[in-house]
């Protein structure tokens, strides 16, 4: 505290007290930001730990998922512009001629004014892709072929499990691929 010069000032004690309060508020704001970043890191760690044991590159399975929430990010040009890409697991929605990114919410919905969308509950055909994203279409074909008699929807969901945040070599990336089976009512 002596180094800060706060107490060595010759100004009135009220001025020194005001500066001390301002410094305390600034430190508190920095602490809150650090805690927010730490929470984001812990969220990613938890998602990877929860997901990695289920990775099976050889087999495809049918899985029931509850409704899930995500924050839409947009296309590839918008991907790095906002915080959501960095703070939440990345999900990519592949349409026939589109590719939209989102941030999967794995815990409480954020308080900030983020737009929240829903991935519907349902039964999904699930497989995994290992490697660079440039080759993911091969895994899409393999999984669609496996589920060809299951009335699959057109949109393919790809959730990055092991990505550039934890692995430098893109040959080691791991992506969970989900294709929803259409409801037949």
Each PLM stretch: what is its role?
Residues 1-6:
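Short, positively charged
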Residues 8-14, 18-185:
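A solvent-exposed interaction/effector surface
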